[in-house]
Amino acid sequence: MSPATVITPNGVEKSKRTPLATPLPNPSLQVTADHKLKQIEAPVYAPSHGEVLLHIKATGVCGSDIHFWKAGRIGSLVVEGDCILGHEAAGIVLQCGSGVTNLKPGDRVAVEPGVPCGQCFLCLDGRYNLCEDVQFAGVYPYDGTIQRYKTHPAKWCHKLPDNVTYSEGALLEPLSVVMHGIKTAGLSLGRGAVVCGAGPIGLIALAAARASGAHPLIITDLEPRRLEFARKLVPTCQTYQVDRDLDAEANAKQIRKLFDVEAAGEYGAPDVVLECTGVESSVITGCYTARRGGTVMVIGVGREIMNNLPFMHLSLAEINLKFINRYRDTWPAGLQCLGGGILDLKSLVSHTYPLEKAMDALHTCSDLSNGSIKVQIIDEVDDVL
């Protein structure tokens, strides 16, 4: 396949797809290989076999969208050409391609953005999040969801309960990341936990850890406004503002004091640390914070190489340093959490922008000084087909 060839999530080259005339334009937000953003009208295609055509109603802006824009890559994932951004999405089915039996026009769905090959040993083993041939929306060369019309395999579209909004449906993707991390970490009822980072992922992790029964529960961040928001989201949590003048080990000692380790001993230290920043100093702090035999789950995406991890401490204390890549089999459970009232994440959406101002949404998300939590791009137009 040449670099100029773009494949859609069902493996069909765009050049072989059937264009579809629509009554409204299809504005999209694209990132370029030279680190620019552009808003242009994108083509619309009829759904192929097994696909549905969606009207994307809400897309959340993720930190990875900012990385692709500013840095042009995340690890080995490189922006080599124009690509529509966005992967945290919900929408409504407009058309169904042949062979689709699980959805019909009018169904409201959350969009699971990764489409694995379904044939490798990892897919056959149920670990499709590790598929090397996954086609992930918003990761070059696969167009994402910051557009009005998008085709997607019906298999990876999940019906929304009637009481779950499109905005909440667009939170399913980051919630899925957290759910996979919590399950892999083995978070236990009544055991202490620390969440490092009060950004969108960290705040969702805080709410999910509380719903999972973790206690005591502490969240850390450099930004006091985010910690204030965390206390409103989960009033029973404690907060710790990271001290820039202290090193990672010293900050960890201060965090452990909140668990009353001096009185309870090492047993009282947090059993699980959910590291949601990907920042090296925060990962190191998490390693020193977890109790001996505990787990540090790195959920945040950080640098390709970290050279300063406390290897000997991790070894002698038998700290389980774990990692996740996206998620698997989390979307149905996530919908149950939202529809069943187990989690209420609506307050995380701090800013919304219409689709035509999607570029403003990314600028807002990239500027930490404005206090944004989760920025979403919405499209409320009707009669789109």
Region spans (language model):
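C-terminal hydrophobic helical "lid"/dimerization subdomain
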Residues: 2-24, 261-262, 284-285, 328-385
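Residue-level marker of beta-strand positions
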Residues: 27-28, 88, 108, 122, ...
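NAD(P)H dinucleotide-binding glycine-rich loop of Rossmann-like/cofactor-binding domains
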Residues: 117-196, 245
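N-terminal Rossmann-fold NAD(P) dinucleotide-binding loop
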Residues: 202-203
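Glycine-rich beta-strand-centered segment in the early N-terminal region that forms part
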Residues: 43-59, 74-121, 161-163
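Adenosine-nucleotide cofactor-binding segment
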Residues: 195-198, 210-283
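Glycine-rich phosphate-binding loop and adjacent beta-alpha segment
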Residues: 214, 237-244, 277-342, 379-385
